[in-house]
Structures are given as structure tokens and as C-alpha cells.
Amino acid sequence: MSKLTIWLTPIWILAVGVTIGALILLLMWGVTWLVNRRAARSIAEAVGEGILRPISYVVISMAALALLASPSMPVDRIVASLKRLPDVAPIEAKIEIKPRQADFEVPASFRASELQSFTITSDQDVAVNVEAKKGFVEPLILVQGGEPYSWAPGSSTPRKFEGDASTLFITNESDSPANVSILMYTDVETPQVRAIPIAAASTVGLYVLYLLVRFLAPRTSVIAAATAKETIAQPLFTMLVMIGVVALVAFVFIPYNTFGEDVKMLKTSGMTMIKVLAIIMALWTASTSVADEIEGRTALTVLSKPVGRRQFIVGKFLGILWPIVLMFIILGIVFLLTVSFKVVYDARESAKTTPEWTECYLEVVRIIPGLVLAFLESVILAAISVAVSTRLPMLPNLVICGSIYVLGHLAALIVKSAAGEIVFVRFIGKLLSVILPVLDHFEIEGAIAGASSVPMSYLGWALLYSVLYSGAAILLALIFFEDRDLA
């Protein structure tokens, strides 16, 4: 592989997933066209005029990358592994084999090349084969009673299994029953393909979510679309995106002098910068689209139409949220590219062996949960900013939300440091942790940079926390705005 192919392959895999998601969306739209052409036209209009339009440009760019880069990519391996995804799963069996029983059949369908590890234990000596009538004469694996036979990559124990297997034949020649336990872990030969269905599902989910909001809450969606379109047209949005792109590219070539840990510094700096830019965009938009419209009596004109105050606030919040999504998508893709390239770049600068593309993929895939958590943190601060904007202008809004951002990251530290100390300080720390969002839960850049993986359960709880706190902030915004005199 060329160096370009090495660092581009991880992004190409994600691009393939996005392309598959786009094809699924086109198929769904085609079915809708056959069933209800009016609904299909409405969907096409929604994609063409809302926030989905710039997102669609990004999707088309990813599809072009997936198509143009295919000749230099391991397409055959990727396709073969994709086909095998439904067939790989842990194999677990606990059986009792009668005394002097030969060729006891245990269903176990796997490929030897896909084995990640396996352990076979028995309280009696048994012979394990993949063919019948071998027994103890030609045993493939001989398991001693009370001594587990374990294999994993790099272990001194031979794997023994070769080719494909559908059944294990176990022979027990002892005079006592044998209790046998089998545990096998398998995975496709290119496990990186698991990112393809996730990318496809994320693409489909984003479009479906936007269309559901549009058709289930049309008035709210109109306000959200107008706010999002106005936000994207602002020079600030373009400026922040350009600053992010230039900074992310520059981070690759900045010498951090970390003795081989420059990739970690790049990941930490990049995630923090994207999050801060998104928060700045959210605070500015909330101030201009909510506070300024209230002060300029534009909100009074909007509410004179059949639009309620609740629809106005929720629409403004969604209108702020969609540009943040777009910013994370654009800067996130650039960030993934720079991290993947940084792995190859550092190896070249340090005169090390050229890394495999799987190493680039590993660094890339680890930062995606960090980007998700950064986005959830931005959502919380956007909701708080909307609530503050219903009563205060831009400058107080920026000061309050900036203070909440700082205290939200320090609340957990204050509580820990005040344990067993002054009662008043401990009380203030606990009060801050209850009232303010504990943003420290979303601050895991150090763990991600240190090659730690983020479990899906953690992302799930973070999503629930973000939804609940954002919902509470929007509820507070509705209370503030309900009795606000707009005249």
C-alpha cells in the first residue's frame, strides 16, 4: 500500500458506510414515490431547502470518495468480511458426555481464520476433532482432565483448527462421564467493517429524524429551518468552520515534543477545539436569533401568526441545533482525516516502520465517541443559552453561559477536594453539582487520547443526561418566555 492509501483507508471505510446509508435513503424515497407521490415531493423539498442540503453535499462528497478510491482499497476483503458479519458470534456449550462415548456431536460453525480465542475444559481426558471416527487415534486436540486447553493470538498453545468447521466431535474413553465446556470467540477477518453498518445507520437516522420533526411538528420545523438557514448564512459560521479546518490541518505539523505521543496531543487539542467552536456558535446564535428578535419585536410579528410561544422556543432551539450538527460533521470528517494522516506522518518523521492502515483506523475510531460526547455537551449549553436569551441580551448571555461552562467542568473537582473540609465549601460544591450541568462527564479527551475505549453504556447514559438536562433547560426557557412582554 502507498502512504496515501494507508491513511485514507479508514476514512474510505466510513465513506462506504455513508454511501450505503444514502442508497438506503434513495430506496426508501423511491418506495415512497410509488406509494405517495405528494409525500415524496415534500421529502425532496425538505432535503433541498433545509439543513439537509449542505449535509447532502457532505454525503455526496463521501460517496465520491468511496467510489474514486475503491481501485486502491482492499475491496475484496471488505466485501468478504461484510458477508460474514451475520455468521460470526461467540460459541458457548456445556455438555456431559457419557462414559466411553465416541464422536459426541457439538454444533459449532466457524472458520479457523476468524477465531479470536477459544477455551475447552473437561474434568476427564477427551479428544476433540472436526471429523468423525478420529477419536484418540488421531486427535486434533487432546484435552487433559482438569487442564483447560486455551488459545489466543500470541500464545504458545497451537490453534490446531484449520479451514471451516461445522461440528465438533468429542470422544470420552474414560469410565466416568465428562463435563465439557467450550467457549469460542470469532470475528470476521477484517473487523473494521463493523463501522460500515454503523455509519450507514447514522446517515439514515439523521435524515429520518429531521423529516420526522418536519412532518410531525410543521410549524416548529418552519421556525427551525428559518433559524438554521439564517445561521449558516452568517459570516460567523463560515469563519468558525474555516478556523477549525485550518487549525486541524496545522495541528498535524506542529511539533509537540512529546517523544512519540504527538497523536495523543492532536486528538486532545482537536476535540477540545471543535467543541469550543460549536459552543461559541450556539451562544452567538441563541443571542441573535432569540434575544435580538425579542428586543427588535420580530418575535411579536412571528407570534401574531398561528405560532405559539412553545413552538417558537422549541423551533429556535432546533434551529440552533442543526447548524451545530453540520459543524460537527464537517470538522469531524476533517479531524478524522488529520488523525489518520498524523499516524503516518509521525512514523515518517521518526524514521519508524510505515504503519499498517489498521493502526490508523484504530486511532480514528477511538475519537468518534469523544466527538459524540462533545456534541452532547454543546447541546446542553445551547439549551441553557436559549433559556438565558429569553430574558437577557447577548453580553450577559455569553458571561453566564461561559461561567456555567467553567463551573460545570470544575463542579466534580470542587466536591472531591472539599470532602472532609470546610462545610460551607462542601455545600457550595454539592449545590453547584446539583444545579449546574456536570460537564466533566463529557470531558474524556484524556482517556480517549490514552487509547482507552468508551463503552456504549457510557454513551447511552451521557445521551440520557444530555436529553434530560436540555429538556429541563428548554422547560425553563418556556417558563421565562411565557409571561415575557413582547410589545
Language model feature labels by segment:
Residues 26-49, 206-232, 482-486:
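Juxtamembrane interface at the cytosolic side of transmembrane helices
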Residues 41-52, 224-229, 290-319, 481:
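Helix-loop-helix units of permease transmembrane domains in multi-pass membrane transporters
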Residues 229-242, 395-396:
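Membrane-interface helix starts
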Residues 68-195, 199:
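Beta-strand-enriched, solvent-exposed domains that form extended recognition/catalytic surfaces
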Residues 241-244, 316-317, 324-325, 329, ...:
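Residue-level recognition of transmembrane alpha-helices
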Residues 10-33, 55-63, 67-71, 191-207, ...:
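Alpha-helical transmembrane segments of multi-pass membrane transporters/translocases
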Residues 56-74, 243, 247-257, 360, ...:
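Transmembrane helix segments
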Residues 4-24, 30-34, 197-202, 206-208, ...:
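Secretory targeting signals
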